[in-house]
C-alpha cells in the first residue's frame, strides 16, 4: 500500500511539473508575440512544446530576400536548467556562426549558459536577427578563428566579400528551392507555404493593403493605436515578400 501511495505521489508531482513547464513555455511564446519581431515567425509544435518551428526572412544586407526554415529545440528541463536552446536550420545556411555540418547556430557567444530568471527566447531571436543583419559584427568579439563555428567562411568574409556574397546567394537559392516541399512531419503547427494564387490570395492581399492605408491615415491624423492584423507571403518571379500591416 505504501509503495502504491509513493508511486501515485511521484506521478502527481511529475504531472504538476509538466503543467508548470507548459505554462512557462506558453509565457515565452506570449513574450515573443508582444515583441513583434520583424521577419521571424515561430510556433511551438502541437505534439511537443519542446520543439518549435520557425521561418526567418532576411530583409537587409547579404541575406536580403532570404527565407530560411529552422527549428528551436528546448531541453527537457527548460527553462529551469542551464541548457541554452538550440537553433537548427533545415538546410545549410552560409554564415560565420552556422555549422556547415549540423546546420546549427552557435549561440554561445551571446548565451554562455541559460539564466532562467533573465534569458528568454525572444532575446535569442533578436540575436539571430542581429547576426544576419551584420555577420561581420557577429564575430568581431570572438578572439580566434578556431573558436568560431565556420572558420573557412570567416576567412572568406574577411578577405573576399564578393565570394562570400556568392556563397550566401547559393544557400538562399537552395533554401527557396525547398520551401514548397511536402512537410517532413504531420504536425498541424508546421509552417506551410503555398504559391500565390490570385483567386484565393488576391482578396486577402487587397484587404491587407486597405488596412495598411487605413492605419497610415489614422496615424497621420494623430489617432495613434498599434497596427495589428494579417500577414502574408507573396510568391512572384522567384521572390518572397513578407507583407503585414505591422
Curated annotation (Swiss-Prot):
Residues 20-177 form the UBC core domain. InterPro entries: UBQ-conjugat_E2_core, UBQ-conjugating_enzyme/RWD. It holds the Pfam family UQ_con. One of its GO terms (biological process) is defense response to bacterium. Belongs to the ubiquitin-conjugating enzyme family. FTS subfamily. This is Protein crossbronx. It comes from Drosophila grimshawi (Hawaiian fruit fly). The gene is cbx.
